[in-house]
Amino acid sequence: MSSILRPLARHSHESSVWYSGCRSSSLPSIPATTARSPAYSPSWRQIRHNSQTPSEVLPSRPKQSSPRRTTVLAIALSGISAGLGYYFAHTQIAWDAASSSTGLSNKYGTPGDFERAIQELRTTFGCKDAVSTDPNILHVHGFSENDYHPGSAPSVVVFPQSTEDVVKVVKVANKYKMPVTPYSGATSLEGHFRAPSVGGICIDLSGMDRILEIHEADSDLVCQAGARWQDINETLKEKGIPLFFPLDPGPGATIGGMMGTGCSGTNAVRYGTAKGEWFLNATVVLPSGEVIKTRRRARKSSAGFDVTKLFIGAEGTLGIVTEATIRLTPVLPTTVAVVQFPDVRRATEAANEVLRQGVGIQCVELCDDEFMKATNKYGQSTRKWPEKDSLFFKFQGPTPRSLKESAEIARRVAEKHGGTGFELARNEQEAADLWQDRKNALYSGLALLEGSRGWSTDVCVPMSRLPQLVYETKKDLEETGLVSTVVGHIGDGNFHALLMFRTDEDLEKARHAVHRMVERAIALDGTCTGEHGVGIGKRKYLYEELGTGTVELMKSIKRTIDPYNLFNPGKLYPDNRPSAEREPQPKLVKPRDT
């Protein structure tokens, strides 16, 4: 086991300054954001924790009662307890339901409470730069260039360096009933780190980016939540350790955020998603301020619930992950091939058959004709691409021979389904160049419409229904007058669209088109999000996708763990009633025969 006690290499200067606990610049303060409602009295949970009687003052043991009397008393007490439990549980649920549209509490502290909380945070952390109310910093932590959901700034941003620091912040938040929003890589596309309208505390975990332990013999690694997956893999490579962490969402994504959104990426067809077995355990600060470690480091365990997974996909609403143990996997040789098809249906059929052959596939990506046109226009490729629906394969295997065999099987299957121009990289550099064209999806897409911005979204359907989804969505966008590229993790039915727009009018068109795409995916037995998460943007679809029982169970878990709804309020959990402006279900169009 080697212990890495330095920050990751991505900002060596910045990280070393973080280690000292303070930054050099001083930041002016501004008043806290106004709150809407006063705090309310402590819950039963607080009473329980604060009323334990020391053993030395416990009452003496009473005289032994007769068995019959004991039985009658037990039955009576059971009835009373059940009745009170039912009353308080249902009273609390009814009270919560009346307090917000989601059925979760929204009774936060007053503006004065928030001011006192900020002052206590400054006193607790001492260093001015550990607690900031600088307007620019608040804006960065409440708004995003990655999406077009409404922004809202926090009242204060705190920069912890350890789990203990996070606990201190959460205890202050509890004391003053101040909402808490976790923040790290800021790569979210669905508004996950927006502050609630009342303001609150933003906990910026980006400074907690250290690798704490590497266990090469066990193929795992312990790191803080702010560590970025790319930096982790680069560190392993620099140390000559032939292992890597295979989840590959957007550049800059951190381990904490990846857990929170249940992310994946292009490698999902081979390695699965964050909801698989890639996170062995996590250190989590609960809304009460209690710290738990979800399990030990064994590769598998059947001891009780898999508590780690409770926090994967919870989007910071149940707890704040501060450390995690992640599984690593061997680095194997890879190569890349590209092939063109007459249409998406035949490309999908070819990809499905290749996967069923058991070929060593690490990634298989669908890029539509508009994407290939955009790649040519972007001008960064080493070649001129045929502007047709295409598949990008990344093959993986232990030897060069195994890679060639996999590529040959893929070529034969592709040609069987009408594929043409199969091109296999001749060396590592050519493979890197080919794959880079796929990774440039955002920038090449924006080149398709000069001066445009882009709305990126994702849905996922069973693989057999992906051609129908792509066809209907492209037809919809064409009729709407929007320019878009389509990229899909075709091996698992995950479909991404980048909708370009220049004007506010086109932005609204894009917003409605995304809504129709989501409704279409759910109607095809799919999901509103394959890997971006729910956040603000997709929460209204959960009742339709998951059903009332499942959503209410999620809310019950939330109320139990976070009765004050302090952790990341406004995300994930949908309103109790459907929106009055909800659009009708789109008509499904039968795909053309091609």
Predicted regions and their residues:
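Noncatalytic alpha-helical scaffold of FAD-dependent oxidoreductases
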Residues: 2-594
